UniProtKB/Swiss-Prot annotation:
Cross-referenced PANTHER family: 30S RIBOSOMAL PROTEIN S14, SMALL RIBOSOMAL SUBUNIT PROTEIN US14M
GO BP of this protein: mitochondrial translation
Molecular functions per Gene Ontology: structural constituent of ribosome
UniProt keyword terms in alphabetical order: Mitochondrion, Ribonucleoprotein, Ribosomal protein
Assigned protein family: Belongs to the universal ribosomal protein uS14 family.
GO cellular component labels: mitochondrial inner membrane; mitochondrial small ribosomal subunit; mitochondrion; nuclear membrane
Compartment list: Mitochondrion
Keyword Cell wall biogenesis/degradation attached: no
Protein name: Small ribosomal subunit protein uS14m
InterPro entries: Ribosomal_uS14
Gene name per UniProt: Mrps14
Predominant location: mitochondrion
Length: 128
C-alpha cells in the first residue's frame, strides 16, 4: 500500500516539475575548451604568489645580473599554464571566446538574445 502511494506521488511530482528543473541536462562544462581554461585558471591561481616573487627578483635592476638570470630560469621552469596571460574569458553558455561581456560572462550574441527576451535583470534596450 505504501509503495503504491509513494509511486503515485513520484509520478505526480514528475508531471508537475519540468524535466530541465528536476536534473542537470548536460555536463557542467559546455565543451573541452572551457574545461581546459578552468585548468589554466586553477594553475595560475596556484602559482600566482611564487610567480610574483620570482618576477620581482627578475625585474629588479639593483640586484646582480647572475641573480636576475637565475630568476629568469626559474620562471622558465614553471608550468606554461601557470602564466595568467594564457587565461581566456569565455561565454558560460556557449564557450565562445570572443565578444564576451565581462560583467555577465556572456557572449554578445547570447547577451542580446537574453536581453531581448527580458531574461537579464536590470538590462533593457536603449529607447530614445
Amino acid at each position: 500500500m505504501a509503495a503504491s502511494v509513494l509511486g503515485s506521488l513520484l509520478r505526480t511530482f514528475r508531471q508537475a516539475v519540468p524535466p530541465s528543473a528536476s536534473g542537470q541536462v548536460r555536463g557542467y562544462y559546455v565543451d573541452w575548451r572551457m574545461l581546459r581554461d578552468l585548468k589554466r585558471r586553477k594553475m595560475a591561481y596556484e602559482y600566482a604568489d611564487e610567480r610574483l616573487r620570482i618576477n620581482s627578483l627578475r625585474k629588479n635592476t639593483i640586484l646582480p645580473k647572475d641573480l636576475q638570470e637565475m630568476a629568469g630560469d626559474e620562471i622558465a621552469a614553471l608550468p606554461r599554464d601557470s602564466c595568467p596571460v594564457r587565461i581566456r574569458n569565455r561565454c558560460v553558455m556557449t564557450s565562445r571566446p570572443r565578444g564576451v561581456k565581462r560583467r555577465w560572462r556572456l557572449s554578445r550574441i547570447v547577451f542580446r538574445h537574453l536581453a531581448d527576451h527580458g531574461l537579464l535583470s536590470g538590462v533593457q534596450r536603449a529607447i530614445w
